[in-house]
Design a protein with these regions (language model features):
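Active-site-proximal mixed secondary-structure blocks
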Residues: 1-34, 39-104
Length: 104
């Protein structure tokens, strides 16, 4: 379910550091991973972008895709998606198609 939010309040979605799902795409393959280490850096009024820092490492399959492609999508799941959010974080997209496995 999508909701419209005043972009000036976008930072409230990531303070204090919620658990999020981040999707990436590399070589035609989509992936999603669970992350809880992020923080807002600022908001650009001209572009409408909220700059966010995330903390992960090069060992992370999706982190490599983000470094290579310079893009990702951040999803803030609701409480009703808690079980799936946790489960997504227990497997690697290098071995499993998480979109297929979790019906995304």
């Amino acid at each position: 379910m999508y909701q419209t939010l005043d972009l000036n309040l976008a930072f409230t979605l990531v303070e204090p550091s919620p658990v999020v799902l981040i999707t990436t795409r590399d070589q035609g393959k989509d992936n999603v991973f669970t992350l809880s280490l992020l923080m807002p850096l600022g908001f650009d009024d001209d572009s409408g972008c909220c700059n966010i820092a995330i903390m992960t490492g090069r060992w992370n399959h999706s982190a490599r895709a983000m470094l290579k492609n310079k893009q990702c999508v951040l999803h803030v799941p609701t409480a009703e998606h808690m079980a799936d959010t946790i489960a997504i974080g227990t497997v690697s997209g290098a071995q499993v198609d998480k979109f297929d496995r979790f019906g995304l």
